[in-house]
Amino acid sequence: MPDLIQTKSVVLGYGVKMVLAPAKAARSLLIREEAVWRFSLPRVLSTPTTMLETTEPIAHASELDKPSIVVTNTEVDSEDNTSSVLGRYIPQKCLQNARLAAVNSCVNEIFEARFRERPDAPAVCAWDGSYTYRELNDRSSALAHKLRRRGVQAEVLVALLFEKSKFSVVAMHAVIKAGGAFQLWDPSLPVARLGGMFAESKAHLVLASAANARLAAEISENVMVVDESLVPPWESAPLNPGTQPENALYCVFTSGSTGKPKGFLMDHRAFCTCALGVGELLGLNGASRLIQFSANSFDLATFDHILPFLCGACLCIPSEEERKGDLTRAFNRYRATHAVLTPTVSRLLEPEKLTTLQVLLLAGEAPSREDIRRWASTVGLLNGYSPAEAGCITIVNPSLQESHPSKIGFPVSVVPWVVDPDDCNRLVPAGEVGELVLQGHTLARGYFGRPDQSKAAFIPTPAWVRQFGYETYGRLYRTGDLVRFDAEDESLVYIGRKDSQVKIRGQRLELGEVEHALQQFFPRPQIVVVELLTAEDREPALVGFVYQPGSSQHMPAPPQHQDNSLFLVADDQFCADAQKALASLRDILPPYMIPSDLLRISHLPMVPSGKTDRRLIRMRAVDLAPEERRKYSSVLGQSRDQPVTQLEESLLGLWATCLKLPPSQIGVLDNFFHLGGGSLEAIHLAAEARNMGFAELSSAAVFQCPTIREMAGMLDGVTASVQEQDPRGCTSFQLESSLVAELLRKSQCTLEDLQEGFLPLTPFQEKTAKMKPMHLLLDIPGIDHSRLEAAWALVLEKHISFRSIYVEHQGRVYQAFLRQPDTVSIPIRWCDEPVHECAARFCEQDVDLILDGRPWWSMTRINNKIDSVLVLRLTHAQWDALTLDVLFKDFMAAYESRELSRRDLEFPAYMRFRLRHNASPATVRFWSTFLHGSRLTQPLLLDGAAEVDPGNEAMVFVSQQIPMLTPPHGITLGSVFRAAWAFVLARYTGQEDVVFGEFVEGRSLLVKSVEKVTGCAAAETPMRIVVSPTASVRDLLKHSQEQYVARIPYETCELEDIVPSSTSWPTDTTFNHILVIQHEPVLPPVALDGRPCPHRWAFHGRLEDVYVQMVFGPDTLHVGMSGPEIRLSRTIATQLVEKLASTITQFNDRPEALLSEITV
């Protein structure tokens, strides 16, 4: 065909210029054979569909009957034509509200502006405290100065390792103010993963909370712990970090296909450009309260932590317990107006019960129709989309109520190009499916140390960007997501992924990373494939498929494959291997990346190109009937144990609802997490359980008792995993033989004299053994003396603790237990004066400390002609309240020749078990966790100007009586007392996280008959309560009770043992004061032969400690303080007791009030 000569140029529309041009220069599309029309149009239009649509009218309008048309590239002639052509690829409506210009500002500059506008406005409202903008500014500035001295400046990266806390906000802003960049870490991630991210990002420093200090130390030697002492509340000197918009702001890691997470940096310009547009869409302003829920490993957590401060709003941070508990209640408690949640998390909320929520942005995964239905009439509902590399939220559907779930909406701050999935240099017309490429100033820089992956994802500018004049709108990122523009509203519609990236529970992951990790446990030639299975009737599940060539012939799947021959029955060996692999993955991958099941496949299906046919594997697995799935599963393959109680039946129904599984697929011994459950499902299960009256089943309990049988046991009060133990055979605790020999020498005893050998005293016993003895005086006029001696002989034979002796050696006191003598002799002293005066004088003289092996317990009868008093000398190291009750009931029974109570467990056996329990790793771990990051609260109890006389033995006693109270439902009066004292302490000291001592009975060990042991089981142990100023009274009461319950199994461990093993406190730390809850009376009414025998106590010397007491009377409560005058001012005690009594009453009467409304 001859070349043609250009004769004229005609603009035909859409930027098309019809020309005559050499045939070899044109891209030809044959329309007619006989003649050729040549015309040019931009390369962006050069797709077959576009050419057909554009050339068809030209061919019909031609004077030639049989033209042939050739398309070539050309430049767009005019701005109008450019817009017209662009509209063929990006609908005009799609871009009309996008903010494409860069915001050339830094986060610290915008925060400073908001602070100057409203310095006293609330900035942070967290479970552990609140800050105004001024307070946040001052504290973060103070920390920023310290960071600058530690080398933090522009482009220096700092890792943040915090639980949900106000301190994470301070740390984040401090890094930004110092000029550095941060990466927010989730402490629940495996330490190996955290260490890998630290190394790959070349982070300089780890800022950690006190609770995570030890974990941080495993990752880096350069650790700074952030707590109240490091962020003083006073204003710091201004700091000019010199940050530029192009400097790094934060680092994020996402899942990587090579087996390691991919990290990248986001700069200030990118974040500000993205965030300000989203903030405007959400309507965030000074009255807004955004609640922070996302896990720290999720990029949305970074978005949550910064966005409110750019808009003058308040960030609300619930605790981990609140996040995993009643989420609806937490939203209401913090008065949240805005939230950014995954649809999965939003399903845990009850929309009709939310009182303040106004705007909900769903992000991280696709919502369902049911999600839209639940929320559409309740709040302003939006959907957000964006890969982390392109900005936190770059595309938003602002009217999700009226949309299909797949519509992701319109761009906020990017240009959404849709390209040929196989060639990103070619655009596809609006309405056709293609890969989404995002262009804008919101993009990350690229991946750490991965130039090839960076080049593949952050692509060079294609020619069509320049042709449309869009080269000034930033760089481009290939999302890997397939989308199209909707024909009706011109919004973007999400179709699916083009690669191996998937999302589960809002987290994006590379299937290749999971496969890489799993392959280590099934070495080649075995082949591992991991896929995300989705079905309408259940939550998405990550499932692994293992092909073992030795088990079957390797063959591609035939097209007509319609049965289940793809799968092999899971034998015992495969099940064992699979369970071992899944358990090992928990050490190297986050929970959301661990497959819920492994299936064994008979062959590896392939497509004609030789690649694995993943689609076929997914289809076959999803189509498996439940009974078929059970045969092939490595975790579901065991036989199902059926419920045997009504409680187990009820729990099975709850599981089926939460896991979206038929009840027939669940057995009472199945593991909740092996059936596809995760932390969110655990929260859902706990919430559903509360609705059915199982308030004790928390999400934490789901992790502790992951089977139905264990849960039922826990709810019944007896777990399958923890049974009461019999300590009588516990002989593992022994002293060194040389020490025993020395104690025998000092006590002048032989082993034959002892029924039980030497044991150390508990700290409380030792403290009381070093005090002067106390005396109990019992009126016994007319009581037969021989019967009296015989009765006490029986009582002392049974109760070995009153045959104890004490020996001091090198500052420690040890106890041993004498054999019972054949007879008991009670001496009688006669006097002429009133018997009580004589008894009092006798007690005053009988005050020697006995730490040389002589018995403490002694009895003397003092008579005159009319009256008689039995004086019993004893030490609190021998008894507690329960002991005296049992002791005197046995005494009355013995005197009247009745049968004594059953002897179940003797005190020495109990003590050996207790000593072993207190030193156990579980006890050490509990106290390390319970007290981590805390400090003992030491309120000022003396007047500053008061002079202290060490010789002053005077005591202070202050008490106030209040009517007996009925506490709120589900709360004990003890919990009210603890919470009220914590509140008074917090107000008095300014320390919201308070720790004080508490006297406990010490009978919480899982030991048979522990309640019948006679001896001193009492202990003085720490109690920690956090008084959040934003909490309600009920929140604090519940927290107080939860702390008490959590401590119960470990309350026998006392401060002297806890400090060196579980804290970083000074080893000489002692309690400033001790809480005591006492139920009067300590002794039962004593009567012998029907004759009442009144009793009274005689105390000597001075108590060394300050006690805060609540004593239960018949119809009243007595609240008071007591202590030595050299340690407790009467004035201060009076003030504190008044505040305490008032607080107890207000807490009891106004449980729904906010703590800020309580006046003291």
From Swiss-Prot:
<keyword id="KW-0596">Phosphopantetheine</keyword>
<keyword id="KW-0436">Ligase</keyword>
<dbReference type="InterPro" id="IPR023213">
    <property type="entry name" value="CAT-like_dom_sf"/>
</dbReference>
<dbReference type="GO" id="GO:0019748">
    <property type="term" value="P:secondary metabolic process"/>
</dbReference>
<feature type="modified residue" description="O-(pantetheine 4'-phosphoryl)serine">
    <location>
        <position position="679"/>
    </location>
</feature>
<dbReference type="InterPro" id="IPR010071">
    <property type="entry name" value="AA_adenyl_dom"/>
</dbReference>
<dbReference type="InterPro" id="IPR036736">
    <property type="entry name" value="ACP-like_sf"/>
</dbReference>
<keyword id="KW-0677">Repeat</keyword>
<comment type="similarity">
    <text>Belongs to the NRP synthetase family.</text>
</comment>
<keyword id="KW-0597">Phosphoprotein</keyword>
<dbReference type="InterPro" id="IPR045851">
    <property type="entry name" value="AMP-bd_C_sf"/>
</dbReference>
<keyword id="KW-0843">Virulence</keyword>
<dbReference type="GO" id="GO:0005737">
    <property type="term" value="C:cytoplasm"/>
</dbReference>
<comment type="function">
    <text>Nonribosomal peptide synthetase; part of the gene cluster that mediates the biosynthesis of the antitumor fumiquinazolines that confer a dual-usage capability to defend against phagocytes in the environment and animal hosts. The simplest member is fumiquinazoline F (FQF) with a 6-6-6 tricyclic core derived from anthranilic acid (Ant), tryptophan (Trp), and alanine (Ala). The trimodular NRPS fmqA is responsible for FQF formation.</text>
</comment>
<keyword id="KW-0963">Cytoplasm</keyword>
<dbReference type="GO" id="GO:0016874">
    <property type="term" value="F:ligase activity"/>
</dbReference>
<dbReference type="InterPro" id="IPR000873">
    <property type="entry name" value="AMP-dep_synth/lig_dom"/>
</dbReference>
<dbReference type="GO" id="GO:0008218">
    <property type="term" value="P:bioluminescence"/>
</dbReference>
<dbReference type="Pfam" id="PF00550">
    <property type="entry name" value="PP-binding"/>
</dbReference>
<dbReference type="InterPro" id="IPR001242">
    <property type="entry name" value="Condensatn"/>
</dbReference>
<comment type="subunit">
    <text>Interacts with the mitogen-activated protein kinase mpkA.</text>
</comment>
<dbReference type="InterPro" id="IPR042099">
    <property type="entry name" value="ANL_N_sf"/>
</dbReference>
<protein>
    <recommendedName>
        <fullName>Nonribosomal peptide synthetase fmqC</fullName>
        <ecNumber>6.3.2.-</ecNumber>
    </recommendedName>
</protein>
<dbReference type="GO" id="GO:0019184">
    <property type="term" value="P:nonribosomal peptide biosynthetic process"/>
</dbReference>
<keyword id="KW-0599">Photoprotein</keyword>
<dbReference type="Pfam" id="PF00501">
    <property type="entry name" value="AMP-binding"/>
</dbReference>
<feature type="domain" description="Carrier">
    <location>
        <begin position="642"/>
        <end position="719"/>
    </location>
</feature>
<feature type="region of interest" description="Adenylation">
    <location>
        <begin position="132"/>
        <end position="520"/>
    </location>
</feature>
<dbReference type="InterPro" id="IPR009081">
    <property type="entry name" value="PP-bd_ACP"/>
</dbReference>
<comment type="pathway">
    <text>Alkaloid biosynthesis.</text>
</comment>
<dbReference type="GO" id="GO:0031177">
    <property type="term" value="F:phosphopantetheine binding"/>
</dbReference>
<dbReference type="GO" id="GO:1900781">
    <property type="term" value="P:fumiquinazoline C biosynthetic process"/>
</dbReference>
<feature type="region of interest" description="Condensation">
    <location>
        <begin position="749"/>
        <end position="1025"/>
    </location>
</feature>
<dbReference type="Pfam" id="PF00668">
    <property type="entry name" value="Condensation"/>
</dbReference>
<dbReference type="GO" id="GO:0043041">
    <property type="term" value="P:amino acid activation for nonribosomal peptide biosynthetic process"/>
</dbReference>
<dbReference type="GO" id="GO:1900809">
    <property type="term" value="P:fumigaclavine C biosynthetic process"/>
</dbReference>
<dbReference type="GO" id="GO:0044550">
    <property type="term" value="P:secondary metabolite biosynthetic process"/>
</dbReference>
<keyword id="KW-0455">Luminescence</keyword>
